[in-house]
Swiss-Prot record:
Compartment annotation: Mitochondrion matrix; Mitochondrion inner membrane
Region (G5): 332-334
Organism per entry: Gallus gallus
Region Disordered, annotated ranges: 39-73, 260-319
HAMAP family for this protein: GTPase_Era (MF_00367)
G3: region residues: 144-147
Signal peptide boundaries: none
Residue ranges with Basic and acidic residues bias: 269-284, 304-319
Region named G4: 213-216
Protein name: GTPase Era, mitochondrial
Keyword hit for Zinc: no
Gene Ontology cellular component annotations, sorted alphabetically: mitochondrial inner membrane; mitochondrial matrix
Transit peptide, from-to: 1-35
All residue ranges annotated as the KH type-2 domain in the record: 380-461
Length: 461
C-alpha cells in the first residue's frame, strides 16, 4: 500500500483517466501489464496501448524475419515494393550519443535480434545502417549511426570520413531522435557531449527523447535526480523541473535501492499541469550513521510547472551541459529487456501516417556480407588489445551454400605485422578458434541457418 503522502499526491494530480500511475524501476511485483509498462520510467509517455504480447524477442509482434544469405536475394527484398497496409504509419528514429554509449545494443534490443556489432571499444559502428521493425500497420526505421566524434579524434583514430558525416546525415531523415547517455560512466554522464549538442541545436525542430542507459548499475539512484536536472537544463516537455529532496535513513529498511517514477498525463492532457515524480527508497550499506538511528523513508520528487523557454542559439554549446527541449525521458536497465519493450511501445505510438519504406520481410538494410564483416570485426575488437584490431583488414574468399544447405564462409584476416598475427591466432590457435566459434553462432542467429566459418590470418606483404 502506498504511503499516505503518496496517496495524497496521486489524488491531487488525478487526471481524466484516473490517478497517476506509480512506477517502480526495480523490485516491482509485475502482477499487471501496467507495472511492466511503468518499468521503463518514461516521463510523459502517455497511456499504454494495452498489454504487450510477450514473445521470445523484445517488443510486440512475431519473431523478426531472418536475413537472406544471398546478396542478390537480400537486395531484391530490400529494394522490392513494400507490402503497404491500408493505413500505413511510419517513424524514422535516429539514435545518437557519444561513442560506446550503447546505441547499437539498444538498436539490437529494439529489433529483437543482433544485427549491429557491439563491443566495449569505441568506434565499433563504422557506418550508418538501418534496422526495420514492422508491427501490424506501423513501421519503425532505426538509423544506427557511429558515435558522434570530433574531426580531431577522427584523425587520431584514423576514422573514415563517413564516421563524421553519417550521424548528421541520419538526423536529416529522422522524425524523432533518441539521445543515449550511459549513466554508469561517471566521466561523461554529467553533460551531453559537445558534438551531441551541436547536432541537436542544428535540428531543433526534430522531437528528441533522452534515454538514460544502465541505470541499474548505479549504486545510488538519487544521482539520477541531479543527472536529469543537468542533462535537461531543468526542463522537460516545456515544463520547468523543481527538485525537492528529504533524506532520512532507516536501519531496518531493505538493503536495496528502489526507484519509483510517476507518469505524466497522456499527451492530449499536457496543456494542463503535468507533474512527474521520482521517489527513491534508499538503504545505504556501510553508512556513517549509527545502526540504532531512527528510521524514516526517503523521498524525492520532481514537480513541473509551465514557463517560457528561452531560444536555444546555435553556437552556445560550449557553455551548456544539457538540452532543454527533450519531450520525454526514459530510463533503461543494462540487463533487463522489459524497459526496452516499453520504449518500443512508445515509439510505435509516435508513428505518423505515411508510406512504408521497406517490405515487412526486411530486418536490416545491411547486406549479408556487411553483417558478416561487422560481426567478425566485433570479436576482433573485443579480444585484441589497444590499436591492434583497428589494423586488421578483412577479405572474404568464399561465400557459398553447402550440400546440406549450410552457409560456408572463408575469410582472410590481413594484419600489418607478424606480432599481430601471433596475437590474433593465440596460443595453439585458441583465440582465432574462439573468434570463429562466437562469430559463427551470432551469424546463425541472424541468418537462421547452419554456418561453417573458417578464418585465416596472414601478414600483409
Amino acid at each position: 500500500m502506498a504511503a499516505p503522502w503518496l496517496q495524497r499526491w496521486r489524488g491531487a494530480y488525478a487526471g481524466p483517466s484516473g490517478p497517476l500511475r506509480l512506477v517502480r524501476l526495480h523490485g516491482v511485483q509485475r502482477s499487471s501489464w501496467r507495472a511492466a509498462h511503468a518499468a521503463a520510467g518514461a516521463f510523459g509517455a502517455g497511456p499504454h496501448p494495452g498489454p504487450p504480447q510477450r514473445a521470445a524477442n523484445p517488443g510486440p509482434g512475431p519473431h523478426p524475419p531472418p536475413v537472406a544469405t544471398s546478396r542478390e536475394k537480400h537486395a531484391r527484398i530490400v529494394q522490392g515494393r513494400p507490402d503497404q497496409p491500408a493505413e500505413p504509419k511510419v517513424l524514422r528514429i535516429s539514435i545518437i550519443g557519444a561513442p560506446n554509449s550503447g546505441k547499437s545494443t539498444l538498436s539490437n534490443q529494439l529489433l529483437g535480434r543482433k544485427v549491429f556489432p557491439v563491443s566495449k571499444k569505441v568506434h565499433t559502428t563504422r557506418c550508418k545502417a538501418r534496422g526495420v521493425i514492422t508491427h501490424e500497420d506501423t513501421q519503425l526505421i532505426i538509423l544506427d549511426t557511429p558515435g558522434l566524434t570530433s574531426p580531431m579524434k577522427a584523425k587520431r583514430h584514423k576514422l573514415e570520413a563517413a564516421m563524421l558525416t553519417d550521424p548528421w546525415d541520419s538526423m536529416k531523415h529522422a522524425d524523432l531522435v533518441l539521445v543515449l547517455v550511459d549513466v554508469s560512466d561517471h566521466w561523461t554522464r554529467n553533460s551531453l557531449s559537445l558534438e551531441v549538442l551541436k547536432c541537436l541545436s542544428q535540428f531543433p525542430h526534430i522531437p528528441s527523447v533522452l534515454v538514460l542507459n544502465k541505470v541499474d548499475l548505479l549504486k545510488k539512484k538519487i544521482i539520477l535526480l541531479g543527472l536529469i536536472n543537468e542533462l535537461t537544463e531543468g526542463i522537460v516537455n516545456g515544463k520547468k523541473l523543481k527538485v525537492r529532496s528529504e533524506f532520512e535513513y532507516n536501519s531496518s529498511s531493505p538493503a536495496k535501492t528502489v526507484l519509483k517514477v510517476t507518469q505524466t498525463p497522456p499527451p492530449e492532457n499536457r496543456a494542463r499541469e503535468s507533474p512527474c515524480q521520482l521517489e527513491t527508497d534508499k538503504a545505504q550499506e556501510g553508512s556513517s550513521l549509527d545502526n540504532s538511528s531512527d528510521v524514516k523513508a526517503s523521498e524525492s520528487s520532481l514537480d513541473t510547472e509551465a514557463r517560457e523557454q528561452k531560444p536555444y542559439k546555435y553556437g552556445d554549446q560550449k557553455n551548456r551541459k544539457g538540452w532543454p527541449h527533450f519531450q520525454d525521458i526514459f530510463m533503461l536497465a543494462a540487463l533487463n529487456g522489459e524497459e526496452v519493450d516499453t520504449l518500443k511501445q512508445y515509439l510505435l505510438m509516435q508513428a505518423k501516417p505515411g508510406p512504408w519504406e521497406f517490405h515487412s520481410r526486411v530486418l536490416t538494410s545491411q547486406s549479408p556480407h556487411e553483417i558478416c564483416d561487422n560481426i567478425i570485426r566485433e570479436k576482433i575488437l573485443e579480444y585484441l588489445p589497444l590499436e591492434v584490431p583497428y589494423g586488421v583488414t578483412q577479405v572474404t574468399e568464399l561465400w557459398e551454400e553447402g550440400p546440406s544447405g549450410e552457409l560456408i564462409i572463408v575469410q582472410n584476416l590481413v594484419v600489418p605485422r607478424k606480432s599481430h598475427k601471433l596475437m590474433l591466432i593465440g596460443r595453439r590457435g585458441a583465440l582465432i578458434s574462439r573468434i570463429a566459434q562466437e562469430a559463427g553462432q551470432d551469424l546463425m542467429n541472424i541468418f537462421l541457418c547452419d554456418i561453417r566459418l573458417k578464418l585465416k590470418v596472414e601478414v600483409k606483404s
